[in-house]
Amino acid sequence: MPRSFLVKKHFSASKKPNYSELESQTVYISPFIYDKFPVIPQPEILSTGAYYTPLVWDTGLLTTFFTSESDYKKSPISPSSSDDSSKPLDLTSFSSEDEGGKTSDPPSPASSATEAEKFQCNLCSKSYSTFAGLSKHKQLHCDSQTRKSFSCKYCEKEYVSLGALKMHIRSHTLPCVCKICGKAFSRPWLLQGHIRTHTGEKPFSCTHCNRAFADRSNLRAHLQTHSDVKKYQCKSCSRTFSRMSLLHKHEETGCTVAH
């Protein structure tokens, strides 16, 4: 390790370097540093024919596909085998060695159907062309029959997920209890709406009238009274109502048919 890394040197921040001590302040750049990097020539622009070479059939190369000259002369592409030189070549008679001398015929409809239905469900025997289609089928249909269910210990209801079962159990245990009257609820927001009945707070007001409500659902039901569409109709007097509860109240109080 150099000594400069082991010895501490204390420099004064107020002391500035004296550049006049240098023999010369001129900077020299050697012209030989660029000799090591040769200049890359510009690419030569070729004509269109250089990029798109025409396809030329050389019949002299076809002799390499035959074992002897006699086989080449007997072939249909030999010039001596046919007098008509303008007759097109029949390339379907040749095949590669890997295919064993068989021509590549188009697939039959039976083989196409087998290829399209190669993924089969082992539960309902339905077939699919892709593995993704088979997986989606199992997830939506077949898995629902074999899927593990979670049963409630308070009633006979069953749920697919454990989270849904826990939310249902709250309707039996009622963990949210009002400290004023002792009434219990299954959800915190139900308890919060109940506490407003004790405090008298009604933060949800109607924009059409001066009525206010402690719960948003009550305000939503009240807004239907201002709607022009009243789809609940009394069968006796043909009077229409915006809510089913208002129709039931009308029928319980006694419907008076005007004669």
Curated annotation (Swiss-Prot):
Ubiquitinated. SMART domains: ZnF_C2H2 (SM00355). Maternal expression is nearly completely restricted to the vegetal hemisphere. Zygotic expression begins in the dorsal marginal zone just before gastrulation (stage 9), and is almost completely absent in the animal hemisphere. At mid-gastrula (stage 11-11.5), expression begins in the ectoderm in an arc surrounding the prospective neural plate. From stage 12, anterior expression is down-regulated, while levels are increased in the prospective neural crest. GO terms for molecular function: DNA-binding transcription factor activity, RNA polymerase II-specific; RNA polymerase II cis-regulatory region sequence-specific DNA binding; zinc ion binding. Transcriptional repressor. Acts upstream of snai2/slug, zic5 and other neural crest markers in the specification of the neural crest and neural crest migration. Involved in embryonic mesoderm formation. Residues 1-20 are annotated as: SNAG domain. Interacts (via SNAG domain) with limd1 (via LIM domains), wtip (via LIM domains) and ajuba (via LIM domains). Interacts with elp3; the interaction inhibits snai1 ubiquitination and promotes snai1 stability. GO terms for biological process: negative regulation of DNA-templated transcription; negative regulation of transcription by RNA polymerase II; neural crest cell fate specification; neural crest cell migration; neural crest formation; regulation of DNA-templated transcription. Gene3D superfamilies: Classic Zinc Finger (3.30.160.60). A zinc finger (C2H2-type) spans 119-141, 150-172, 176-198, 204-226, 232-255. Keywords: Developmental protein, DNA-binding, Metal-binding, Nucleus, Repeat, Ubl conjugation, Zinc, Zinc-finger. Belongs to the snail C2H2-type zinc-finger protein family. Residues 71-113 are annotated as: Disordered. It is found in: Nucleus. PANTHER family: ZINC FINGER PROTEIN (PTHR24388), ZINC FINGER PROTEIN SNAI1 (PTHR24388:SF37). This is Protein snail homolog Sna. Induction: By two classes of mesoderm inducing factors: transforming growth factor-beta (TGF-beta) family and fibroblast growth factor (FGF). Pfam families: zf-C2H2 (PF00096). GO terms for cellular component: nucleus. The keyword Nucleus applies.
